[in-house]
């Protein structure tokens, strides 16, 4: 168990640093946070590639923990959401995939709003 936690932690260390660097390098375009978009897209690609490769070839658990859970987890949680949505699509559950997208996007926006409301209530 300690080994697995270390793999996740070290992967997360590198994922967080990569997120910081990429977010700082990519300029804001069209008034949108394109740095965040960039890391979300990169993380989604990496996790999708890793997990879909594992359907066709054995990928060691250590790689999945280090790259998938650690690196991509720190880089973005959006990668897991994207992969899970495509699993629903692959299983022919298009309605559930669309519902997953709607709930995640709208739900996360609502939670940010609630966090904002709480922070303003505390610090104003």
From Swiss-Prot:
Give the Gene Ontology MF terms in alphabetical order: fluoride channel activity; fluoride transmembrane transporter activity; metal ion binding
> Its principal location?
membrane
Parts of the chain that traverse the membrane: 6-26, 37-57, 69-89, 92-112
Q: Does the keyword Zinc-finger apply?
A: no
* Compartmental location: Cell membrane
- What are the UniProt keywords, alphabetically? Cell membrane, Ion channel, Ion transport, Membrane, Metal-binding, Sodium, Transmembrane, Transmembrane helix, Transport
Which named protein is this?
Fluoride-specific ion channel FluC
Q: Which species is the source of this protein? A: Methanocaldococcus jannaschii (strain ATCC 43067 / DSM 2661 / JAL-1 / JCM 10045 / NBRC 100440)
């Amino acid at each position: 168990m300690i080994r697995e936690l270390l793999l996740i932690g070290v992967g997360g260390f590198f994922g967080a640093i990569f997120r910081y660097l990429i977010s700082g390098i990519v300029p804001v375009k069209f008034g949108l946070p394109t740095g965040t978009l960039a890391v979300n897209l990169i993380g989604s690609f990496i996790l999708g590639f890793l997990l879909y490769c594992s359907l066709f070839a054995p990928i060691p658990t250590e790689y999945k923990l280090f790259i998938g859970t650690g690196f991509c987890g720190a880089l973005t949680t959006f990668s897991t959401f994207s992969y899970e949505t495509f699993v629903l699509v692959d299983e022919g559950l298009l309605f559930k995939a669309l519902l997953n997208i709607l709930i995640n996007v709208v739900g996360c926006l609502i939670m940010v709003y609630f966090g904002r409301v709480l922070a303003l209530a505390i610090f104003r």
